């Protein structure tokens, strides 16, 4: 029996009431589910509006059965069209595909995804260069597929973790 656990933690940024991060979990029509993390450019209300704009497009496409690479490209085109290449958002999709028994990990973000699995996989950082959504006309996602195996863990995060402590000169070595 397959046991899948999801945990989400969200902490407000200092002196800001709203975060630009949006997290959703959606069931896929052909089996499986997708966890989505979108981070809108900047902070505060404007950032939240950007992330919700992208998230609503991503959710609609996933519910229609589109695959993750197509979803990421369409979300990029949508943001690029509506904001004329002037705002960006990062996107991470972690999909459990029950038909192929794989994890499909899709990124348009400078934040890596950590995958830990049983030997021989071990710990891997999926950190190939990826452009954010919305800025450049030909942006493409980075997509990796990993076999589903007992004990596999995936950790994705937004730039709040990656850049924590940087202003105070105490960066984390993520």
Language model segments and positions:
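Beta-strand-turn-beta hairpins that frame and shape the catalytic cleft
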Residues: 3-5, 29-33, 98-102, 149-150
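Active-site-proximal, acidic helix/loop segment immediately C-terminal to a metal-coordinating Asp/Glu
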Residues: 43-64, 148, 152-174
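Glycine-rich phosphate/pyrophosphate-binding loop regions near the starts of catalytic domains
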Residues: 36
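Acidic loop->beta-strand submotif enriched in PP2C/PPM serine/threonine phosphatases
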Residues: 16-33, 89-91, 125-168
């Amino acid at each position: 029996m397959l046991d899948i656990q999801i945990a989400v933690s969200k902490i407000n940024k200092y002196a800001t009431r709203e975060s630009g991060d949006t997290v959703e979990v959606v069931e896929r029509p052909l089996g499986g589910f997708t966890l989505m993390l979108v981070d809108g450019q900047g902070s505060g209300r404007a950032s939240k509006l950007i992330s919700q704009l992208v998230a609503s497009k991503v959710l609609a496409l996933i519910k229609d059965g589109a695959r993750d690479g197509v979803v990421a490209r369409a979300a990029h085109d949508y943001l690029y069209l509506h904001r004329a290449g002037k705002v960006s958002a990062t996107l991470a999709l972690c999909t459990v595909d029950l038909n192929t028994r794989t994890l499909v990990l899709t990124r348009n973000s400078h934040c890596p995804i950590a995958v830990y699995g049983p030997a021989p996989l071990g710990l891997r950082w999926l950190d190939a260069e990826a452009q954010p959504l919305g800025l450049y006309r030909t942006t493409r996602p980075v997509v990796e597929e990993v076999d589903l195996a007992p004990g596999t863990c995936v950790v994705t995060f937004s730039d709040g973790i990656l850049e924590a402590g940087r202003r105070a000169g105490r960066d984390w070595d993520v």
